[in-house]
């Protein structure tokens, strides 16, 4: 019997949680990559992504949503002064993080607070897909 590790898909797919909960049998989820992030289920139809972007100014961050793909980029402005580090433990590299969004997931806003970039998402169910009551005659 083969086991498939779906955790790499789960980390960057938002809105598919019901499907992954059925497919994923207590698979461990690793949080590799830069920058680190969390995906929070706020309620049944709302999600929040928190990305650790300490050291980035708001003007150095770019968020793009196209089709079902959310792209977050961070690019430091070119620094003119060369520094000599005795120890460098803080990552200062540029990044691009992509999140695959499920159908009907829309970005509602973003804000930067204390080095964390919060991106709010909402599942918007079209009227045609909502359950409707059928009258019995």
Curated annotation (Swiss-Prot):
A GO biological process held by the record: protein stabilization
Pfam families the UniProt entry points to: HSP20
Top-level taxonomic group: Bacteria
Subcellular location, record wording: Cytoplasm
Protein family membership: Belongs to the small heat shock protein (HSP20) family.
Quaternary assembly: Monomer. Forms homomultimers of about 100-150 subunits at optimal growth temperatures. Conformation changes to monomers at high temperatures or high ionic concentrations.
Entry keyword annotation includes Membrane: no
Single GO cellular component term: cytoplasm
HAMAP family for the chain: HSP20_IbpA
Alphabetized UniProt keyword annotations: Chaperone, Cytoplasm, Stress response
Protein's name according to its UniProt entry: Small heat shock protein IbpA
Domain sHSP: residue ranges: 28-137
Known function: Associates with aggregated proteins, together with IbpB, to stabilize and protect them from irreversible denaturation and extensive proteolysis during heat shock and oxidative stress. Aggregated proteins bound to the IbpAB complex are more efficiently refolded and reactivated by the ATP-dependent chaperone systems ClpB and DnaK/DnaJ/GrpE. Its activity is ATP-independent.
Signal peptide extent: none
């Amino acid at each position: 019997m083969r086991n498939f590790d779906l955790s790499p898909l789960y980390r960057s797919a938002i809105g598919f949680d019901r499907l992954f909960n059925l497919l994923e049998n207590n698979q461990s989820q690793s949080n590799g990559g830069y920058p680190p992030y969390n995906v929070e289920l706020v309620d049944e139809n709302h999600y929040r992504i928190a990305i650790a972007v300490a050291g980035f100014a708001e003007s150095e961050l770019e968020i793009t949503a196209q089709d079902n793909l959310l792209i977050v980029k961070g690019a430091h402005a070119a620094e003119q002064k060369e520094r000599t580090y005795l120890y460098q433990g803080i990552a200062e590299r540029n990044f691009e993080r992509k999140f695959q969004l499920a159908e009907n997931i829309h970005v509602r806003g973003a804000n930067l607070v204390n080095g964390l970039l919060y991106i709010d998402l909402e599942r918007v169910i079209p009227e045609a897909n909502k359950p409707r009551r059928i009258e019995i005659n």
